[in-house]
Amino acid sequence: MSLSNKLTLDKLDVKGKRVVMRVDFNVPMKNNQITNNQRIKAAIPSIKFCLDNGAKSVVLMSHLGRPDGIPMPDKYSLEPVAVELKSLPGKDVLFLKDCVGPEVEKACADPAAGSVILLENLRFHVEEEGKGKDASGSKVKADPAKIEAFRASLSKLGDVYVNDAFGTAHRAHSSMVGVNLPKKAGGFLMKKELNYFAKALESPERPFLAILGGAKVADKIQLINNMLDKVNEMIIGGGMAFTFLKVLNNMEIGTSLFDEEGSKIVKDLMSKAEKNGVKITLPVDFVTADKFDENAKIGQATVASGIPAGWMGLDCGPESSKKYSEAVARAKQIVWNGPVGVFEWEAFAQGTKALMDEVVKATSRGCITIIGGGDTATCCAKWNTEDKVSHVSTGGGASLELLEGKVLPGVDALSNV
């Protein structure tokens, strides 16, 4: 799915117009301080373009966290983002304490030319996601008439709509699909993300390698299935490798992750790989632990030896890393989704770190390397490799759904050209 037939910001006339822009400011926070401003920085080019081209105002809307439709300003307010934003484009930012309603509509109706306005968290209203929780924690559904009113109020805040929230593009939420304005364009971040993935999936450089990690096979079945039609090689690592190894090699895996649901489809996936001529690399050795704990006792195991009862594999070992590095060395394009060990804990981070070093090395020799958001993007931040690979996606779930071959509702809703 690409943006080739969708309106993009560079083709949108913003002069004298109020631009209402959906951004992804869902940033990690600690004690009301922003710990990683990557997503805020990523939105600046679109904001700056509007201001440089004479937009009357830019009204920014975003969610933060999962307040589930209940206002929680102490925990999930976007106010700290307003402070951070001021320092980036060096412009004053007006922060409003709500995102819809008469007062917000009034503030956005005729602002001073060149204003930047940030609305409060969209998810303080249950109408944004269409569902949430009440004060007692029970699930509630939004009233359809109120959803319509919420969307109508958002639509009054601008003359044209820009969506630059790639990280939320897989969600059919009100701010993503319900703003009713004549022109709806994709912002620069949305464009960059979709162009990278479109090229990677529609006309890849070959050999094309997918590195797939993470825990559950069942969660990644669609991903593996779709990628087996596109790639030349695939590394299957992380926790889900144990389900493959138990089914295929009858390996003893101790208390390592085993995905009962996913195990039923392992043989089908392997025969599809064989039919498509895709070379699959699985780990051959492991760093083990006597419990799921940062300070667990550490051991070693191989596929042949098996993992003893009561122990679990939490990282791949040096022989696996060698096999992975050979696959990386053969590739001209790599898409990586999911770490190959519990990288958050030093004792089990070596496999993912060694693989990251190889991917960086491949990038420097001209290989196209795409990191698919989520945990793998966190690895890049941790080891400072964000600018040493071709592209780090800002959207975990959205990039996963693109790699699964799905249509993203937030992109689908943009104006056609």
From Swiss-Prot:
ADP binds at G214, G238, F343. It comes from Sus scrofa (Pig). Catalyzes one of the two ATP producing reactions in the glycolytic pathway via the reversible conversion of 1,3-diphosphoglycerate to 3-phosphoglycerate. Both L- and D- forms of purine and pyrimidine nucleotides can be used as substrates, but the activity is much lower on pyrimidines. In addition to its role as a glycolytic enzyme, it seems that PGK-1 acts as a polymerase alpha cofactor protein (primer recognition protein). Mg(2+) binds at A215, A218, D219, D375. Pfam families: PGK. ATP binds at A215, K220, G239, G313, E344, D375, T376. It is found in: Cytoplasm, Cytosol; Mitochondrion matrix. Pathway: Carbohydrate degradation; glycolysis; pyruvate from D-glyceraldehyde 3-phosphate: step 2/5. The modification N6-acetyllysine is found at K11, K48, K75, K86, K91, K97, K131, K146, K199, K267, K291, K361. Its cofactor is Mg(2+). The modification N6-malonyllysine is found at K131. The keyword Magnesium applies. Belongs to the phosphoglycerate kinase family. GO terms for cellular component: cytosol; mitochondrial matrix. GO terms for biological process: gluconeogenesis; glycolytic process. CDP binds at G214, D219, G238, G338, V340, F343. The modification N-acetylserine is found at S2. It catalyses: (2R)-3-phosphoglycerate + ATP = (2R)-3-phospho-glyceroyl phosphate + ADP; L-seryl-[protein] + ATP = O-phospho-L-seryl-[protein] + ADP + H(+). AMP binds at A215, K216, K220, G239, G313, E344. PANTHER family: PHOSPHOGLYCERATE KINASE, PHOSPHOGLYCERATE KINASE 1. One of its GO terms (molecular function) is ATP binding. Keywords: Acetylation, ATP-binding, Cytoplasm, Glycolysis, Hydroxylation, Kinase, Magnesium, Metal-binding, Mitochondrion, Nucleotide-binding, Phosphoprotein, Transferase. The modification N6-succinyllysine is found at K6, K48, K191. This is Phosphoglycerate kinase 1. InterPro entries: Phosphoglycerate_kinase, Phosphoglycerate_kinase_CS, Phosphoglycerate_kinase_N, Phosphoglycerate_kinase_sf. The keyword Cytoplasm applies. It is an enzyme of class 2 (transferase).
